[in-house]
Amino acid sequence: MVKTNVLFLLIDGFRADKCFGDKKTSVTPNIDSLIQNGTYFEQTITSGQGTIPCVASLFTSLYPFECLVQDGNLSKLNSNIETHIKHFRNNGYDTHATFQEVMHYVGMEEIFVNVDPYPISQMLWNGKGQKIIDNLTNNTMKEPWLYYIHLYDMHLIGYPYEERLKVGPQEIHEEKFGSNHYERIISAIDVWLGKILQKIDLEKTLVVLTADHGIEHGAYTPEMWDLHNQSRETRKQMNISNPKTSAYKLGHKIATNAPSFLKPIRKKLAGMYTDRADKKSRERVLSGVEEKIK
């Protein structure tokens, strides 16, 4: 049986309400296509409010307090815990990762065989996007492969206003790409997602698009400011799409505790499963058995 490749795209700080729905103003034809052809989880709740605990949970399906250890003033992934990526490696997958240098501390070199870190100054529109495309097209990735891409481009919103305009994408200057800078950056990211997706064979590749956590920056109505952090920081988006595999054309679903989505992917793609995890598996949702997860 031919094993399916996995393109695992994580957009750091991508809020759910800015990914899907009539209130978003960004222009995202490629993200929209993934949602239309895949399974979109409308209310995915993150496991933490920072990158390292969230990513650690994604890789292990454990809560951050279970899979992280303290190293001085910082936390890192417990090296004694096997990650889902390790199980993919053990089942013949060639694992690759592109991530910002700050993620080194998680232990990415121990998790993935091939790592490609980039500096904080590098974004999709000034070299990183082309570098990712080169990785996909230079024939160094052996099938079946798993390619984890962690994009920090949304953090541009935290730059001072003038610096944001100076180093940001062309879309950030044009209102047609969104009502605020946050959504215009999303529009710019979507352009590069389209270029990346053009370089893979969707007939034999499962595409996962998700986030680690939300972010507070953006446009809010007065009512939004009254909501608890759960609404603007902990709700993120998650989409699992394989346009050529009808089993995943299931429309919108409700899901919580997002880290468990790697469990059914492991089981379906490589006959792998974990016997230790604190999240509910999404397999029944992906197979159409459950319409909602409570």
Please name every model-derived segment:
Residues M1-K294:
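Catalytic domains that recognize anionic headgroups
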